[in-house]
Amino acid sequence: MAILRLENGTTYTQLADISLELAKLNVTLNYWPIENEATRQLLKEASLTDEEKEIVLTSLDGYFEQLKQEAGYQARDLIVLHPDIANLDTLLAKFERCHTHADDEVRYIIDGEGVFGFVFPDGSQGELTIQPQEYINVPAHSEHWFHLTASKRVKAVRYFTTTAGWVPEYTETVIRFPSLTAV
């Protein structure tokens, strides 16, 4: 389950407590189970072919259909990151600085884990480690950053209303939060 660590040393591990803190940012965190056994088996692989990615996406389309109906999402893809990817650190570097997006950043972590950092309205900071079967929606214009945990492994479904709004717009905010994971 998700873990929220605040700059003041407070740690939350219960979804209700985490959701209460994230509500200050209008960030949504949900638990979406993966019930298809074949999908769970595929997700054990370190990397996936394009065909395997499509099988996984199709098996999870119930969630995509829900997002299409409720919020107008138009597209989704599956990103698979692991240590054997060439230039992984370079790829991730553009998200490890404080930034915003013109569109919501919506992720459904289906394997591995990632860390979203946030700047709260009072200027304090925190980091949320999200794990398999957790869905997060970071609203447009929310100041945040992202990095992988020390395992450097994640499989995440990305949902888009448009890909045009998903370019990072960097801010000058210095990340003060002492990350507990190696980047």
UniProtKB/Swiss-Prot annotation:
Note accompanying the cofactor annotation: Binds 1 Fe(2+) cation per monomer. Binds 1 nickel ion per monomer.
Function: Catalyzes 2 different reactions between oxygen and the acireductone 1,2-dihydroxy-3-keto-5-methylthiopentene (DHK-MTPene) depending upon the metal bound in the active site. Fe-containing acireductone dioxygenase (Fe-ARD) produces formate and 2-keto-4-methylthiobutyrate (KMTB), the alpha-ketoacid precursor of methionine in the methionine recycle pathway. Ni-containing acireductone dioxygenase (Ni-ARD) produces methylthiopropionate, carbon monoxide and formate, and does not lie on the methionine recycle pathway.
Source species: Microcystis aeruginosa
EC number in record: 1.13.11.54, 1.13.11.53
Lineage, opening ranks: Bacteria, Bacillati, Cyanobacteriota, Cyanophyceae, Oscillatoriophycideae
Positions of Ni(2+) binding: H99, H101, E105, H144
Quaternary organization: Monomer.
Annotated site residues (Important to generate the dianion) in this chain: R107
Pathway in which the depicted protein is active: Amino-acid biosynthesis; L-methionine biosynthesis via salvage pathway; L-methionine from S-methyl-5-thio-alpha-D-ribose 1-phosphate: step 5/6
InterPro entries given in the database record: ARD, ARD_bac, RmlC-like_jellyroll, RmlC_Cupin_sf
Disulfide bond sites: none
Protein name: Acireductone dioxygenase
Site (May play a role in transmitting local conformational changes): D104
Keywords (A to Z) from UniProt: Amino-acid biosynthesis, Dioxygenase, Iron, Metal-binding, Methionine biosynthesis, Nickel, Oxidoreductase
